[in-house]
Amino acid sequence: DISDIKDPEPDVQPTYTAAEAVQGLFAHKAVDVRMIPDYPSDRQFGAFYDAEGNCVYAKRGMGYEQIFTDVAVALAHAEMAKDIEGYLPAEHQFEARCAAYVLAKKYGVSTKAVEIDRVPEEYGVMDAAGIRENLARIHDSVKNISSGMYKALVKEKEQEVSPKEKSGKGGDAR
């Protein structure tokens, strides 16, 4: 199962709201993410990766869970495009959805929009090396996006801690 891909995690896994998860996703910054009001009506999803402009465009007005999953798919495309000459998102939609599924599961966002109900037919005729290559691509995308998200979210949580608590000089009157 693709959700078995895991990075080393802290002992206590923090929980995030969907809004915090979206904030972390946007902080990832492998590429710019631009929310646009005049989103193309011919697009199937609420976000897409533009390889020529090296940018993710997302539709304004979506809920946090849809923003997360749709932008996660687009960011996975951006990550994979770094290593593939002439990258075409349509050829890697399954891998990008898998990466978005893992990210959504990891950060507590609903996976309904990116659930995987079947494997593409080409995987049935692919040799083991090809499957491993695709799984490695998914893993690397998840790792890179998650790493950036985690850093941004930890930084955000640390900023919420008061300077008194941070320095350890709380109200201990010994």
Language-model regions: role of each:
Residues Q66-E85, A96:
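Active-site recognition of the HExxH zinc-binding catalytic motif
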Residues D1-M62:
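Contiguous, non-catalytic segments that form substrate-binding/exosite surfaces or channel walls
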Residues Y39-P40, V71, L135, D140:
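Catalytic phosphate/metal-binding cores of nucleic-acid and nucleotide-processing enzymes, i.e., regions
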Residues D1-P8, Q159-S167:
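Intrinsically disordered, low-complexity linkers and terminal tails enriched in Pro/Gly
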Residues Y101-K164, R174:
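Long, well-structured alpha-helical subdomains associated
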Residues A18, F68, H92-E95, N134, ...:
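Hydrophobic (often cysteine-bearing) scaffold residues that line and stabilize catalytic clefts
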Residues I84-E95, K105:
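Active-site metal-coordination segments of metallo-dependent hydrolases
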Residues R60-V71, K143:
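An acidic intrinsically disordered interaction segment
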